[in-house]
């Protein structure tokens, strides 16, 4: 505060003023931060005149603003174009220049201004009426006709200066209004003087020091504080230890032009006339406002105060900066003082209606700017579109032109603005409460539309401008945290209300302008958008157009990383669910640019580029995009990024892109070649926990829940069906098989057993188990003893006692080679590792545990299919084909050891682990594909004599129940079974009754004949030919048991029912062999009573098979479900959709909040432009974006079934075509020949 002037002193070089009485002077100095001037007599008439002059000035200002509204709207549009994001220089300086004029009002704000003007006029009329009724104001001095010109002067004077600078209605010190007390009757004269000084400039950072500094007169020491004000100070003010060195900051008037720097803003005259206060430059002609002494009856200060406080609803804030239309807030401790301060009440309410810039610059010392510039910029540069750069720059240049260059640089808007195009999108720090920053609790808020509170002053507190503190305290009190608007120089801060903020800021409600906060408050509560980030604007204030697609693609090459990142994120948003946009992006070269960004140095750019690529390559309809990405070098670029990045989100995105790419058949081998090693070593092994097996259980579960692991296993699941070469490379990849099995084993007994990761691992192992004997060196090498037994054994076929399910073998070898499931495995000296784990019997237990505990149908199908593949045939020393056998004969040294019969061991291990009841129980599950896989697995298990007996005894009714037709109650449910499943059940029944009359009798007892006859006699399209012929084969085999024919006839069946379809089969049998056709089936040639399906072949048959080897190979390839020409067939997909409701195309959310990657299309990507669209499960390109990106559902087009070949039986030596070949939809039934059943071993079913 300023000390009282000495008697006769002439402040600022003006005429001397009479001395005030000590009491009045002391009160003035304690209550006013403005100039300590007074008219000597304290006349009430001058007070009234001052009030009237100020009110008229306000009305004139409002009137002028009303006239300029229309013109301003037209200019705003042109000014907004300068704020575009793609300015040539990329900086705020390119938006506009200081010489241009700016208008604030936009069309959206017109109605608010007009409402404010109307309300302001009503309140002014009420104030005038109160003055007239109290006798203070002469009715002739004011009339309603004068009202239109009365309000204009207090409004903003925009574009009134040739230099184009903004003139604000008051300096920010006008916020530091002091509360008047009822004990200060003589303060009104001084306040009237201050009211007329509203437009003066202050050349010092403090309100009251302007006069002293301009006149080079040192400021007297502040007087001691007064008691009455001490309680109301709270923690809002403190006395600095020393005046700040950089306090000489200049601020021009916000309402009127700046006066000459060396002159006095106020000139006080005497000499027979009332004291007259002139505003320097208050009008272009420099007119002065005089307040005649006799303009109204003389009133006492107390009467004046009473009349204002009781009759007028208007609150006036009078401060050292004049009548300022700025609402201010103070701690509630001064609330009682405010209610008794009439002048405060009047001007503060009028100020509420005025339109002013929300740009409250916070000026600090240079060291504080360097420390808090970002925070200041976030809260201080809240301005209108036109003022984004040029207005604030012009105001600074006019207001701070006298500063030193270093200080001027600190004041410049460019000093505050964080680079828009740098590494990140700017986020405003939250506002902080002053009282909290000082350690005091925030006082409760006071509600009310026109709530006005002021920060009290004290004679003992120097009225230097308040400073925003740099405190980083926690969130504000939810009850009443108001925004701070600190003043310019160093010193304490107080709480001020944001003039454009009606709501209280609290921890539970984020800022309406926050990029990631909740929805915006209602329209009525917000009038301005304070955002200075040109990337995102308040949609109510700024009508930005969406950029065109070529513009967005061009921005991918921008020099600033943040522009590239935002452009990629916007592309991700645009192509969400829109295949046309995806194709257009490809045509315009967007994929190449996005791939180039994968090698960028900025992590944020990687994140956005991967998100966009993931959406672009999602879906089978976008295979062209996938191939384009591959042609652009995208797969190696993704692998490089995966290898070097440590960001978990980016790793998830990269593996998600690879998962989507892997659904394209043409890209499976390129992914195997470029990404298999990195996926295994950088993702699968580390995230599985296999290398660190002693991990804690919770750690294991966390790893198995990893999105990165899920994506990587999904990718490998797809590529594992790419053919023999792909399977070979994956089997030989060190650590892959071990890690996949470890994931499965560690998930057993936990909730993770149904997870997508476990499902993927099981499906990979199932595919790798396909054709294991033929595609591994172990299956292609055999001992000479086994070959001798195969080729030189007894050929008469009469020694049926020595033949069994595994074919004819030498008696001396039988005991050595077979394992009954009890005791240790023969020929197993060391524990299995690597590829050996695929076929070792120890793998049976994890598979069976999955089958008994898991509820995921895809996992169940995968585990059953893996057992089916492993149990197919006896491939221990047998070659898959004649070529392999011949190779073995030539390459194996004499006396080479034979390999164990792993398929025999697998079947025995399933029985030992009580797996047969588990498989039979799954026949009852209501899932077509699971039933199909389980039925085929049971068929392969029945190759074991003991298993066949158990299945015939305990599973026959379940198998028959799955056949369509008959009178069973679930007939409708059975009809829903697919042809593949019905065929699998028929093949299982055929294997079970082969060479087992008891099982054939059990089939008759279970009512199977009726259903089988119904299928074989069906006409039309009720059943496919494949199903009809499979059922006929079972009936033909049953008729071979002569002992059971009497029972059949007793039940009313005749030979016609059993062999009615044999004529067709006979024709196929009699058809000569050709190089283009495989042998057909003839159930008549060999009776199942005399010949087992797994009986050994004679040398003659071996030679004939050698000639047909090539035919089997080609037929098998054509029949494969996962063939080189495509892994999904429309038939298979249709079957899946109709019968299980589950598509082979899995859409996994990627990190999105929904399963679209949403398991989230994860919303991902939300884009600020469309906040309502929630997509990017997971991932927000912008701080406020909802994640709605197309988070491409990773299409697990992993054939839930092993590759086509997996389901196709292994043809060749061990194929019993009568079972296996039925599974091939591509091969006509007539091409199958029953002769193949004579060869030992049983092929894998194709399921």
Curated annotation (Swiss-Prot):
Omega-N-methylarginine: residues bearing it = 209, 261, 279, 293
Main subcellular location = nucleus
Q: What's the name of the protein? A: Catenin delta-2
Q: Which residues carry this modification: Phosphoserine?
A: 7, 264, 273, 324, 357, 412, 458, 511, 1087, 1098
Biased composition of type Polar residues is found at 22-50, 172-207, 265-276, 296-309, 466-475, 1072-1081
Q: Where is this region: Disordered?
A: 1-50, 134-238, 256-309, 429-480, 514-533, 1064-1131, 1152-1176
Write one Pfam family the protein is assigned to. Arm
Gene source species: Mus musculus (Mouse)
Basic and acidic residues compositional bias, start-end: 1103-1112
């Amino acid at each position: 505060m300023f000390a009282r002037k000495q008697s006769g002193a002439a402040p600022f070089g003006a005429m001397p003023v009479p001395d005030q009485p000590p009491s009045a002077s002391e009160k003035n100095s304690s209550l006013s931060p403005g100039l300590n001037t007074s008219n000597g007599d304290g006349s009430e008439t001058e007070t009234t005149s001052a009030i009237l002059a100020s009110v008229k000035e306000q009305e004139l200002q409002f009137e002028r603003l009303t006239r300029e509204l229309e013109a301003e709207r037209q200019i705003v549009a042109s000014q907004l174009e300068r704020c575009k994001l793609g300015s040539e220089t990329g900086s705020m300086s390119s938006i506009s220049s200081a010489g241009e004029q700016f208008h604030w009002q936009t069309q959206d704000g017109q109605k608010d201004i007009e409402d404010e003007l109307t309300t302001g006029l009503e309140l002014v009329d009420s104030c005038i009426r109160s003055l007239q009724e109290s006798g203070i104001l002469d009715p002739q001095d004011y009339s309603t006709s004068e009202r239109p010109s009365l309000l204009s002067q207090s409004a903003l004077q925009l574009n009134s200066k040739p230099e184009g600078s903004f003139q604000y209605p008051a300096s920010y010190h006008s916020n530091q209004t002091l509360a008047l007390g009822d004990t200060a009757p003589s303060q009104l004269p001084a306040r009237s003087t201050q009211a007329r000084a509203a437009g003066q400039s202050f050349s010092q950072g403090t309100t009251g020091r302007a006069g002293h500094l301009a006149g080079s007169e040192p400021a007297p020491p502040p007087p001691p504080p007064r008691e009455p004000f001490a309680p109301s100070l709270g923690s809002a003010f403190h006395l600095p230890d020393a005046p700040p060195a950089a306090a000489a900051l200049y601020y021009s008037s916000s309402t009127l032009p700046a006066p000459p720097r060396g002159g006095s803003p106020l000139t006080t005259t005497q000499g027979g006339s009332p004291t007259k206060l002139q505003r320097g430059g208050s009008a272009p002609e420099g007119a002065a406002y005089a307040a005649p002494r006799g303009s109204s009856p003389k009133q006492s200060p107390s009467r004046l105060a009473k009349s204002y406080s009781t009759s007028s609803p208007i609150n006036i804030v009078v401060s050292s900066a004049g009548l300022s239309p700025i609402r201010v807030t103070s701690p509630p401790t001064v609330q009682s003082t405010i209610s008794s301060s009439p002048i405060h009440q009047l001007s503060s309410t009028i100020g509420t209606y005025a339109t002013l810039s929300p740009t409250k610059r916070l000026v600090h010392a240079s060291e504080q700017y360097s420390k808090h510039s970002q925070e200041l910029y976030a809260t201080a540069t809240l301005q209108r579109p036109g003022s984004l750069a040029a207005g604030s720059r012009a105001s600074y240049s006019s207001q701070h032109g006298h500063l030193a260059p270093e200080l001027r640089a600190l004041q410049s808007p460019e000093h505050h603005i964080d680079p828009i195009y740098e590494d990140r999108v700017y986020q405003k720090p939250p506002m902080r409460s002053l009282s909290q920053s000082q350690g005091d609790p925030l006082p409760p808020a006071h509600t009310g539309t026109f709530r006005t509170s002021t920060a009290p002053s004290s004679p003992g507190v120097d009225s230097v401008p308040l400073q925003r503190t740099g405190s980083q305290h926690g969130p504000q009190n939810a009850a009443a945290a108001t925004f701070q608007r600190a003043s310019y120089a160093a010193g304490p801060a107080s709480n001020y209300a944001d003039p454009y903020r009606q709501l209280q800021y609290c921890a539970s409600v984020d800022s309406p302008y926050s990029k990631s906060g909740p929805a915006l408050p209602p329209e009525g509560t917000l009038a301005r958008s304070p955002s200075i980030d040109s990337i995102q604007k308040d949609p109510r204030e700024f009508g930005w157009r969406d950029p065109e697609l070529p513009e967005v693609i061009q921005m991918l090459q921008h020099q600033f990383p943040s522009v590239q990142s935002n452009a990629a994120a916007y592309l991700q948003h645009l192509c969400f669910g829109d295949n046309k946009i995806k194709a257009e992006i490809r045509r315009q070269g967007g994929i190449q640019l996005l791939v180039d960004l994968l090698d960028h140095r900025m992590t944020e750019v990687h994140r956005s580029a991967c998100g966009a690529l993931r959406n672009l390559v999602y879906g089978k309809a976008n295979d062209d995009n996938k191939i384009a990405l591959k042609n652009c070098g995208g797969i190696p670029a993704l692998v490089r990024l995966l290898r070097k990045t440590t960001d978990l989100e980016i790793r998830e995105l990269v593996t998600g892109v690879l998962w989507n790419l892997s659904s394209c058949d043409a890209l499976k081998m390129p992914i195997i070649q470029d990404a298999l090693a990195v996926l295994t070593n950088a993702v699968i092994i580390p995230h599985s926990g296999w290398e660190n097996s002693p991990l804690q259980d919770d750690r294991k579960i966390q790893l198995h829940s990893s999105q990165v692991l899920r994506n990587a296993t999904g990718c490998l699941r797809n590529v594992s069906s790419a053919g023999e070469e792909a399977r070979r490379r994956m089997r030989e990849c060190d650590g892959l098989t071990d890690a996949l099995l470890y994931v499965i084993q560690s998930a057993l007994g936990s909730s993770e057993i149904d997870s997508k990761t476990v499902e993927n691992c099981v499906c990979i192992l199932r595919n790798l188990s396909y054709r294991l004997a033929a595609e591994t060196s172990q299956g292609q090498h055999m001992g000479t003893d086994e070959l001798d037994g195969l080729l030189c054994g007894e050929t008469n076929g009469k020694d049926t006692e020595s033949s069994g399910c595994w074919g004819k073998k030498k008696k001396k070898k039988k005991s050595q080679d077979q394992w009954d499931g009890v005791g240790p495995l023969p020929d197993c000296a060391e524990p299995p590792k690597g590829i050996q784990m695929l076929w070792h019997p120890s793998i049976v237990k994890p598979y069976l545990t999955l089958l008994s505990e898991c509820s995921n149908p895809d996992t169940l199908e995968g585990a059953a299919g893996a057992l089916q593949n492993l149990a197919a045939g006896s491939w221990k020393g047998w070659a898959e084909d004649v070529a392999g056998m011949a190779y073995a004969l030539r390459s194996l040294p004499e006396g080479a050891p034979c390999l164990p019969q792993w398929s025999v061991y697998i079947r025995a291990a399933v029985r030992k682990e009580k797996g047969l009841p588990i498989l039979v129980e799954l026949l009852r599950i209501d899932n077509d594909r699971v039933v199909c896989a389980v039925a085929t697995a049971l068929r392969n298990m029945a190759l074991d004599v003991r298993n066949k007996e158990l299945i015939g005894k305990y599973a026959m009714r379940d198998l028959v129940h799955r056949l369509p037709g008959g009178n069973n109650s679930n007939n409708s449910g059975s009809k829903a079974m697919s042809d593949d499943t019905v065929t699998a059940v028929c093949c299982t029944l055929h294997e079970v009754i082969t060479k087992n009359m008891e099982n054939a009798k059990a089939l008759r007892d279970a009512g199977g004949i009726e259903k089988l006859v119904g299928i074989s006699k069906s006409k039309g399209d009720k059943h496919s030919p494949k199903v009809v012929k499979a059922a006929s084969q079972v009936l033909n085999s049953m008729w071979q048991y002569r002992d059971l024919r009497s029972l059949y006839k007793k039940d009313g069946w005749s030979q016609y029912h059993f062999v009615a379809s044999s004529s067709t089969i006979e024709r196929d049998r009699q058809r000569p062999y050709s190089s283009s056709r495989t042998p057909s089936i003839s159930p008549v040639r060999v009776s199942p009573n005399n010949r087992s399906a797994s009986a050994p072949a004679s040398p003659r048959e071996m030679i004939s098979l050698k000639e047909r080897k090539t035919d089997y190979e080609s037929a098998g390839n054509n029949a494969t479900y996962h063939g080189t020409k495509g892994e999904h067939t429309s038939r298979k997909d249709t079957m899946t959709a109709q019968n299980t409701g589950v598509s082979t195309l899995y859409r996994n959310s990627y990190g999105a909040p929904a399963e679209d990657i949403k398991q989230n299309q994860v919303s991902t990507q939300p884009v600020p432009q469309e906040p309502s669209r929630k997509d990017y499960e997971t991932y927000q390109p912008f701080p406020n974006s909802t994640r709605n990106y197309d988070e491409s559902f990773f299409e697990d087009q992993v054939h839930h079934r092993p590759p086509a070949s997996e389901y196709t039986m292994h043809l060749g030596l061990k194929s019993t075509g009568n079972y296996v070949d039925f599974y091939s939809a591509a091969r006509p039934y007539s091409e199958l020949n029953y002769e193949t059943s004579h060869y030992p071993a049983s092929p894998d079913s194709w399921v």
